[in-house]
Amino acid sequence: MADQSIISALVLGLIEGLTEFIPVSSTAHVLLAGHFLGFRSPGNTFAVLIQLGAILAILLVYFQKLLSIALALPTSVRARRFVLSVLLAFLPAALIGAAAHGFIKSVLFETPMLICVVLIVGGIILYVIDRLPLTPRYTDVFDYPPSLALKIGLFQCLAMIPGTSRSGATIAGALLMGTDKRSAAEFSFFLAMPTMVGAFALDLYKNREALSIDDIGLIAAGFIAAFIAGIFVVRSLLDFVSHRGFTPFAIWRILVGTAGLVGLWLLG
């Protein structure tokens, strides 16, 4: 197993874990890293399986909360309403994602220029929304009404365009509809769980014939890197956005997108 392949796997896993849950688009960063730095994914199954590291990271960090919600379901109307809200928010992306999976993967994911432009546009939008003098009406994810959750889920569908960011779309939508920054980020975490598990299962099924024991070392390296980085981000993000908002992520998006466009122009 070549050292370069291991380094590529670790870098891609690290990028996946660091960017999956923040509003900068993990897909854009992984694809642009592959395009400009030569860190090529060992295969479609590698890209799918390192996402499992990020999924397990958020499930581990939120295990106690998830267990408390599950135990409260038989007796708590609030817990049942919250679960319903998350499922309603998940539904639009599940339906559209399953129907448009082939087009998204084969067409949109192969367009680096589109990804860079979307990074910049999304960064500008996130910056403007973060600076708006909005008055929050919802500060606790357990108080989100199902109708609000469904609207946030519709925003999540925008993330099917590479470079948009799943968390960025849901957070922007939530802020515009009256949530505070911390709860918007936390609801994005909860919504990520069924969304990422569903996307992982669909991608794994679509690529089932490409599974190979030969790539197990590379997959393990990327998986572990994504898992460790994901834990760090999930544990620190809520406090970060409570104090600093989303402007740093907006600026990062604009810088990465601009650098990507310049790189594409220079490379012809």
From Swiss-Prot:
Catalysed reactions listed for this entry: di-trans,octa-cis-undecaprenyl diphosphate + H2O = di-trans,octa-cis-undecaprenyl phosphate + phosphate + H(+)
Enzyme Commission number(s): 3.6.1.27
One Pfam match: BacA
GO cellular component, one term: plasma membrane
Chief localisation class: membrane
Keyword Iron-sulfur (UniProt): no
GO molecular function annotations of the record: undecaprenyl-diphosphatase activity
Keywords of the record: Antibiotic resistance, Cell inner membrane, Cell membrane, Cell shape, Cell wall biogenesis/degradation, Hydrolase, Membrane, Peptidoglycan synthesis, Transmembrane, Transmembrane helix
GO biological process: cell wall organization; peptidoglycan biosynthetic process; regulation of cell shape; response to antibiotic
Topology in membrane: Multi-pass membrane protein
Keyword Lyase assigned: no
Domain of life: Bacteria
Regions that span the bilayer: 5-25, 43-63, 84-104, 109-129, 184-204, 213-233, 248-268
Subcellular location: Cell inner membrane
Functional description taken from the UniProt entry: Catalyzes the dephosphorylation of undecaprenyl diphosphate (UPP). Confers resistance to bacitracin.
Other information: Bacitracin is thought to be involved in the inhibition of peptidoglycan synthesis by sequestering undecaprenyl diphosphate, thereby reducing the pool of lipid carrier available.
Protein family (similarity comment): Belongs to the UppP family.
UniProt protein name: Undecaprenyl-diphosphatase
Species for this entry: Sinorhizobium medicae (strain WSM419) (Ensifer medicae)
